Curated annotation (Swiss-Prot):
The organism's taxonomic lineage, starting at the top: Eukaryota, Metazoa, Chordata, Craniata, Vertebrata
Stretches of the chain found on the membrane's Extracellular side: 412-434, 493
Subcellular location: Cell membrane; Cytoplasm; Melanosome
Gene3D superfamilies per record: Ankyrin repeat-containing domain (1.25.40.20)
Stated name of the protein: Transient receptor potential cation channel subfamily V member 2
Keyword Cell membrane: yes
Chain positions of ANK repeats: 72-114, 115-161, 162-207, 208-243, 244-292, 293-319
Intramembrane zones: 572-609
Transmembrane segments: 391-411, 435-455, 472-492, 494-514, 538-558, 622-642
Chain intervals for the UniProt region annotation (Required for interaction with SLC50A1): 1-388
């Protein structure tokens, strides 16, 4: 039998007459709908939109007269009707007909023109109680005919369902009996369904990892998964990947959606596949396999924002299978538990770590909920405690820089003088020049830092706009600072507006350092949410109203009433206003859009006056417009803004703490990755032996120790690694879980460890 991976054999199909032209047969059946027809429909038949082909006409030497139709002839409609009904007796005479006409069941004559659906797929699509009696006869007929392209491995050929095979359909129909029948007859268990319908994208689709094993896992068919992995004919490989490099574990991560029903399905299947992999291929670490984006299943969950499966992988603990666990219970006493978490792929000391993915590359707007999961929460807190001095040093440097900035801006020379200070040996000018140079250097430093920040997040900056709020303001401050200083040294007076704008942004950006404290940090988060969610929308609508009413008032003011122009030699003098009349008359006129907008803004904040010139021609219309503007803006929009801001504060109150945690995490990683901080990153945790590997060697991992109090499951008996929190000989002590370098050994061979007292539980 031809192997599934063998290349197609070139051959010419035969034509024995009687085939209907595709355009005539399908006339009136064209699909004018917005979507493509499904693979199988009881309301629409298969089409005949075949691509042009060169065939051998078997009736070439026969007479040209009209011939009677052959009653033994099998066309596609007869074959499809027989297999869809599941009546194998209707296939009598099919082997003889195929042998007589040199045809195969995979010829285009027996497939659907647009999709390439075969009679075997048609039979599998029409199962009754999980079986179809025509499947086995079709496979036997195809095998006996010597088909160089076996029917069992035929796939759909269109862009939408490309690669879809009968085995995929049998798995989707949840028929283990049909799956066994196909695999026993040579079905390719690694066939890839890579059409657009099976790719993750916009619109209706179902991405399951393309492979039959992934489809069975994603549809919760453990019996099919077990058979595919352990069948004696062609066992499926857990290491097989799809066109994106994703394994079955990656596919399970992709289909998770954080709902209770879905996560129960995904986690049970995920754990089952890990245990099956440990039994079938113990030397392979399935969770270390990376896809084409260089992501493991854990990193993929972090990047896609799959919170629940991410939590499950991080906190997975198997009893008796320590080499598959990422969490280990070291010691417990009542509800108090000391747990060890595996930091592989998590700590920022590694390239493309989970922490960096969440902070800089995650697509989900809810990624702030991942940084509060253990061990990330305590790990980030430990890093923060270590980097607090650097954080406040940055704050002190920025504060000094802003004082220098303020002093230079306050002592600027008048615009009539030269903008840049004279290079004379005077104390005032020298200090002013030095201040300008320091401001320029600080602006360049800040600009380079922010450009590097946005370069690292160039794809996802708009997705995570909320936590990049200050970084965007810092970027604008740096740009304004550099441009203003360049204009200053070029003696261009427009440097001053840019300078004071940068000064205002600089003082506002000092609020960035409020994230170092919980109360001010959460308050800052709420301010950002209100600005980005409510205030921006209010300003957009308000500007539309303001521009429309301003243009209307300017147009009406141009039609002010004037006396009729007299005739005679004194005509010019009679139309000129009296002394003081021009100022009085033009004071209330809306002579331009800017003046009208300023007057209307006064109405918005309740400071406008309805007094206007008596000589306005459309006095009533102007009054009506002003009243309408007051109703729409001062009464409607402002009160709506207040209500929306209150709702926003209430809705984000539960997430403000986690968003603040995420902002702290970004600050921690930025301080670790500082372009001027040339110190090597410190690794967190400690190297411990948590068990043995399948080959008997010790299982050593970098672990991070976390103290937890869990009243929900404290009655469970869990295996522990030691009898007390720190090991024998050191009562009531616990190794410091903060950042640590690899332990050094002293002369006696004992490792140097820092110990801190265990926090005691106190009850009132």
């Amino acid at each position: 039998m031809t192997s599934p991976s063998s290349s197609p054999v070139f051959r010419l199909e035969t034509l024995d007459g009687g085939q209907e032209d595709g355009s005539e047969a399908d006339r009136g059946k064209l699909d004018f709908g917005s979507g493509l027809p499904p693979m199988e429909s009881q309301f629409q038949g298969e089409d005949r939109k075949f691509a042009p082909q060169i065939r051998v006409n078997l009736n070439y030497r026969k007479g040209t007269g009209a011939s009677q139709p052959d009653p033994n002839r099998f066309d596609r409609d007869r074959l499809f009707n027989a297999v869809s009904r599941g009546v194998p007796e209707d296939l009598a005479g099919l082997p003889e007909y195929l042998s007589k006409t040199s045809k195969y069941l995979t010829d285009s004559e027996y497939t659907e023109g647009s999709t390439g659906k075969t009679c075997l797929m048609k039979a599998v699509l029409n199962l009754k109680d999980g079986v179809n009696a025509c499947i086995l006869p079709l496979l036997q007929i195809d095998r006996d005919s010597g088909n160089p392209q076996p029917l069992v491995n035929a796939q759909c050929t269109d862009d939408y369902y490309r690669g879809h095979s009968a085995l995929h359909i049998a798995i989707e129909k949840r028929s283990l009996q049909c799956v066994k029948l196909l695999v026993e007859n040579g079905a390719n268990v690694h066939a890839r369904a890579c059409g657009r319908f099976f790719q993750k994208g916009q619109g209706t689709c179902f991405y399951f990892g393309e492979l039959p094993l992934s489809l069975a896992a994603c549809t919760k068919q453990w019996d099919v998964v077990s058979y595919l992995l352990e069948n004696p004919h062609q066992p499926a490989s857990l290491q097989a990947t799809d066109s994106q490099g994703n394994t079955v574990l990656h596919a399970l991560v992709m289909i998770s959606d954080n709902s209770a029903e879905n996560i129960a399905l995904v986690t049970s299947m995920y754990d089952g596949l890990l245990q099956a992999g440990a039994r079938l291929c113990p030397t392979v670490q399935l969770e270390d396999i990376r896809n084409l984006q260089d992501l493991t299943p854990l990193k993929l969950a972090a990047k896609e924002g799959k919170i629940e499966i991410f939590r499950h992988i991080l906190q997975r603990e198997f009893s008796g299978l320590s080499h598959l666990s990422r969490k280990f219970t070291e010691w417990c006493y009542g509800p108090v538990r000391v747990s060890l978490y595996d930091l592989a792929s998590v700590d920022s000391c590694e390239e493309n770590s989970v922490l960096e993915i969440i902070a800089f590359h995650c697509k989900s707007p809810h990624r702030h909920r991942m940084v509060v999961l253990e061990p990330l929460n305590k790990l980030l807190q430990a890093k923060w405690d270590l980097l607090i001095p650097k954080f406040f040093l940055n704050f002190l440097c920025n504060l000094i820089y802003m004082f220098i900035f303020t002093a230079v801006a306050y002592h600027q020379p008048t615009l009539k003088k030269q903008a840049a200070p004279h290079l004379k040996a005077e104390v005032g000018n020298s200090m002013l020049l030095t201040g300008h140079i320091l401001i320029l250097l600080g602006g360049i430093y800040l600009l380079v830092g922010q450009l590097w920040y946005f370069w690292r997040r160039h794809v996802f900056i708009w997705i995570s706009f909320i936590d990049s709020y200050f970084e965007i303001l810092f970027l604008f401050q740096a740009l304004l600072t550099v441009v203003s200083q360049v204009l200053c040294f070029l003696a261009i007076e427009w440097y001053l507006p840019l300078l004071v704008s940068a000064l205002v942004l600089g003082w506002l950006n000092l609020l960035y350092y409020t994230r170092g404290f919980q109360h001010t940090g959460i308050y800052s988060v709420m301010i950002q949410k209100v600005i980005l969610r409510d205030l921006l929308r209010f300003l957009l609508i308000y500007l539309v109203f303001l521009f429309g009413f301003a243009v209307a008032l300017v147009s009406l003011s141009q039609e002010a009433w004037r006396p009729e122009a007299p005739t005679g030699p004194n005509a010019t003098e009679s139309v000129q206003p009296m002394e003081g009349q021009e100022d009085e008359g033009n004071g209330a006129q809306y002579r331009g859009i800017l003046e009208a907008s300023l007057e209307l803004f006064k109405f918005t904040i309740g400071m406008g006056e309805l007094a206007f010139q008596e000589q306005l021609h459309f006095r009533g219309m102007v009054l009506l417009l002003l009243l309408a503007y007051v109703l729409l803006t001062y009464i409607l929009l402002l009160n709506m803004l207040i209500a929306l801001m209150s709702e926003t504060v209430n809705s984000v109150a539960t997430d403000s703490w986690s968003i603040w945690k995420l902002q702290k995490a970004i600050s921690v990683l930025e301080m670790e990755n500082g372009y001027w901080w040339c110190r090597k990153k410190q690794r967190a945790g400690v190297m411990l032996t948590v068990g043995t590997k399948p080959d008997g060697s010790p299982d050593e991992r970098w672990c991070f120790r976390v103290e937890e109090v869990n009243w929900a499951s404290w009655e469970q008996t869990l295996p522990t690694l030691c009898e007390d929190p720190s090991g024998a000989g050191v009562p009531r002590t616990l190794e410091n879980p903060v950042l640590a370098s690899p332990p050094k050994e002293d002369e006696d061979g004992a490792s140097e460890e820092n110990y801190v007292p265990v926090q005691l539980l106190q009850s009132n």
